[in-house]
């Protein structure tokens, strides 16, 4: 009994250490370097793209754009109060989970900033892994999507998620992980949210 009790904390600590090391693994580092090199050589440095990507990154702060889209979707359906209320509550729960509990498991440093930035940008102090913007974007897209409008929601999600690597607030792997987490959580939350905000239309 005591032996089991003594080994359990060690196993949990080993698991936690392995999870914490994942973002710093050589394979992840190579992926991040390749993605950043691609962005630097072929994407960054264009004024129009700077405006789009910095704007998208700012729009994703505190899920502002997703709350606005939830209000618009609720107005369109005739369920403004329930759609806005349930979606906002779901986004708050997702943010608490990802930006609180999940990020605490990793504590990854953010990419080194290269100043001056072409446009102003809010710089968070939380862990870099995973990207909260990417997670909330794909979470909200999963909840709000409809058969006719899903391409618009996911296009917005991809743009906001990608913008975080573009502006060097996140590593590319942070964005991929955040998008995956948000997509899974969104699919799990969708029946709960849509059960009270309107019919769940198939894609």
Where are the language model's segments positioned?
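N-terminal transmembrane-helix/juxtamembrane module of multi-pass inner/ER membrane proteins
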Residues: 2-64, 99-127
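Membrane-interface elements of multi-pass transporters and channels
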Residues: 42, 46, 75, 104-113, ...
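Membrane-helix interface segments
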Residues: 46-49, 79-83, 112, 147-152
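Alpha-helical transmembrane segments of integral membrane proteins
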Residues: 53, 82-90, 149-152, 173-177
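Alpha-helical membrane-inserting segments
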Residues: 72, 93, 97-102, 106, ...
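Interfacial segments of alpha-helical transmembrane regions
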Residues: 72-97
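Small-polar-interrupted transmembrane alpha-helices in polytopic inner-membrane proteins
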Residues: 89-105, 151-164
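Membrane-embedded catalytic cores of phosphoryl/pyrophosphoryl-handling enzymes
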Residues: 115-203
């Amino acid at each position: 009994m005591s032996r089991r009790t003594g080994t359990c904390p060690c196993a949990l600590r080993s698991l936690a250490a392995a999870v914490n090391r994942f973002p710093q693994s050589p394979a992840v580092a190579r992926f991040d370097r390749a993605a950043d090199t691609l962005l630097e050589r072929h994407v960054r440095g264009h004024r129009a793209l700077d405006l789009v990507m910095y704007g998208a990154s700012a729009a994703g702060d505190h899920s502002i754009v997703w709350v606005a889209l939830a209000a618009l979707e609720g107005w369109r359906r005739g369920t403004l109060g329930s759609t806005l209320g349930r979606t906002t509550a779901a986004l708050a729960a997702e943010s608490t989970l990802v930006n609180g509990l999940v990020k605490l498991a990793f504590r990854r440093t953010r990419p080194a900033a290269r100043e001056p930035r072409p446009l102003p940008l809010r710089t968070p102090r939380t862990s870099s892994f995973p990207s909260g913007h990417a997670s909330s974007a794909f979470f909200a897209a999963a909840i709000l999507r409809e058969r006719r409008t899903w391409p618009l929601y996911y296009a917005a999600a991809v743009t906001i998620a990608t913008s975080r690597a573009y502006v060097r607030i996140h590593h590319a792997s942070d964005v991929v992980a955040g998008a995956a987490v948000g997509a899974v959580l969104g699919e799990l939350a969708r029946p709960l949210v849509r059960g009270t905000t309107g019919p769940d239309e198939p894609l």
